[in-house]
Amino acid sequence: MEGYSEANALQFSQEQASSLGWKSYGDPEYVPHVLRYYSVGDSFGRFFGNQQIVAIAKNQLGNEGGQKFWSWWGFTERKEWCACFVSWCAEQAGLLQNGVMPKFAYCPDGVDWFKAHGRWKDGKAVPMTGATIFFDWNGDGISDHVGIVERVENGTVYTVEGNSGDVVRQNGYYIGSDTILGYSSCLLIK
């Protein structure tokens, strides 16, 4: 079991019940109920949400073609899938269900949501682990690509991105690079 999630809490409860010879252990609705009341800026959210979305994203490294992500989103044929990947990871980490992040398949829709919810920082900011990073490859002010911040180290932001050459891979960019449009700040900016 890695990270803290509703699924992991349920698994723990089932293991405890089995080891004790009981039908059930604990309240299966406790974790989802409690998670609804944590604000996105508190230490609980920063630790569990940020680390968890990164761990989920890293577990997908090497996935080619992204069918798992774009079909989860509801598409019946391949589409550009970087935003589907980020949304899928957010859903797996419980961030969609808690209203921390939107489900989006088009990068500008994600940018618009974070801006509308006061959760946007420009590309010169220093992100925290788990932030959503939006890119503008051609300098037109419109996001072309999105990924998840893995970590920041020595002036470089390291990411996990879906649809980076049609695969989930890790990349690195200098903080303040002109190609970084901005970041979500749902949990997430220092």
Label each PLM-derived region with a short phrase.
Residues 1-52, 176-190:
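Non-catalytic cell-wall polysaccharide-engagement segments
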Residues 96-166:
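...with weaker cross-activation on analogous glycine-rich loops/strands in unrelated enzymes
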Residues 42-98:
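N-terminal capping segments
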Residues 1-2, 34, 55-61, 87, ...:
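Short, functionally critical alpha-helical segments immediately adjacent to catalytic or ligand/cofactor-binding
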Residues 32, 40, 139, 143-190:
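Aromatic- and glycine-rich peptidoglycan recognition patches
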